[in-house]
């Protein structure tokens, strides 16, 4: 499309109140599993999820990048759901990748598409880094979610 107007996209679930926008004059990011813009309306509860790495509950960290990404996404889902939110409430991700490459981008993009589908996903920034907190840690993903408040609910 060559229109200059922003193109709102349907939300990932019928319950999501967020507006996902991929302006047609920008690169279409959906193949990489993210959206350019997510608009969330107040009143809402904000949820900030700390960076989730590829370690399991016992602290074991696999060597393979794809295994770490899969575990990090599983950890992220568990953390988001523990707050009472769901993946459809996530509006922003930051992904840190050690030794970033096109091959690693493909793994991350595939994991994001698997979690959010081919249509809509949160806004996302991927940052290549030289090192993360733990020896052998290759990926870390943090999230911000916005959960609309029911009428009369408190933040």
Each language-model region and where it sits:
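N-terminal presequence-like segments and the immediate start of the first folded domain
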Residues: 1-74, 78-91, 98-155
